[in-house]
Amino acid sequence: MVPIYTRGGDVLVGPVYVAGASDMPCLGCLEYQLTNFDSHAGLAVSRAAAGARIGASHGLDIREARDLLVDVVFRSGGDRSGGRAVVGTLSGECVGVGNLTISPLCRLGGHVATCVGVEGPRAAGGDADLLVPGLRGGRFASAQSRRDMIAMSCDSLFGPVVGPRRFESISPGVLSGSVVPPVKNAGWGRKRTSLDADFVGVLEALERMSSLPYHDDAVVRQIDGDERCLGPADLGGYHEDQYTHSSSRISADAPEEWVAGWGMDGARVWVPAEIGFYSYFPEYGIADMASVFDAERTPLRRYEESSSGSATGATYGEACTHALLEVVERHAFMSFWYSSVLLPRIPSEVLSGFAREVEQWISNRGHEVSLLLLSSPYPIISVACVSFNARGEYPAVILSAASGLGFDAVCETALWEMTNMVGGERTLSESEARARLISKWDVMEAEDHIAFWALPERAPFIRAKCRGSLLSEGEVEKLRGRRGAGSRLDALSALSYLISEFPSHDLGAPVFVDQTNVTIGALGVSCVKCIVPGALGVSFGFAHQRVAELRVLERLGRSDLLASTDDLLPHPFP
């Protein structure tokens, strides 16, 4: 429900968020609440529905409420594509306009206190215990708590999540998506029950909504020379031909902008803005929809970053933990990709019953599966799943990956991730892929990475990387026995435990950027982006693969990639 608040003769349209101990009215700052009605459900229907719901809930005349929305909101003269919120009067007079972003945050002067910001170091140690190997606390352990979270997050008209979108079951279990205008689907949930699939999909949608800074002040142009920051030597840089190629969407001349992250020691570490918030475009600031709708946008970014390392959690520490696991998963996969060392394969006979069921489902659709045990810091287990089309047809190869502390759960997740790609629709047909991807430089988006390696003639290259020896049953049992399911760790201990072996893998101490915005905070969850110095990154586009200056490539026997792009290939997208 969207309340109407009156302040003298002024009217505010928007939800209530909690700021500290008091309830503060604000405009919500979800762009689609007001400016995307027409793109979501049809303008006429949405206006009437909004008026009816507001009038019914606040005792206002329905016509009066509808006129307020039509005359004040939709005729305010604001630029819809950039997002506008309105302060008006019941007579329809517009007395103030404020920007909206999908962050979201309150952009009207009197309500900035509702913004959720990080004013100092965030300590994970105060969080509730996390269960190992799942590394989740108890807040959402019950089915009712998950139902309540879905109910709080979803509203068919005003969001923040419009609602779950159930997909026809194309594999064992249930697949749900979460609809967030203006995109068709912003979060995927794949679980064994509808409730759990909806819940995971909603959490992922909230995670994606946190990909922009929560207020302008979060981004700074200058930092003190004595302060810690991460640059190309920590994150990877580009070769000159990557900067200059026509397929590049980055620029060495882009402004250097920074956001604050926090190390395990509580110290502030500055991170490039496009790394800390992967949807951030410097030329548009926090007006994210403006960048989406501007087809002529200029490439003023220094990084073309994926969402790797972003996670939501019931607490800040829980979010940090799962963000870290995703970085390790992607780094382990990329290490496998760049290295020429063969990794051990996991035999089907040792898999759990559910994993074998999923594997059989994939096999029934004409694909052969190889599960590889990736090299990752103890105690984390990372697995890659490689699916080969038995007929040698397009898509000839599909890849996925997963990581965690439980061997069976990690294998199940890696296989499960594969099912949607094996059974779902192709983003690009084979003819479209061939016409679009003439050379490696033509790989520019996530679907290009996938399609490039799905072409049949490239299958032998990947098959050659999947010929390692099979793990023995004894080796698998050691992996299963690393930690008992009943063990408990507080979040700080869990993070310390997970990173204890990082130095031996040429990985630095993680840095955490708190992406929690006002909506996420009001729902009582946190969103975090984790950055690990030295980790191999997953990027969108061959020209944006950051390999220069990453010394981990020397350990992998790929010093040639530090010198030039001659032997560099587009990475698959796990």
Explain the meaning of each model-derived region.
Residues 32, 75-76, 330:
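A structural signal for alpha-helix termini and helix-coil/disorder junctions
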Residues 1-68, 104-110:
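E1/E1-like adenylate-forming module used to activate ubiquitin-like modifiers
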Residues 81-574:
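Helix-biased "structured C-terminal domain" signature
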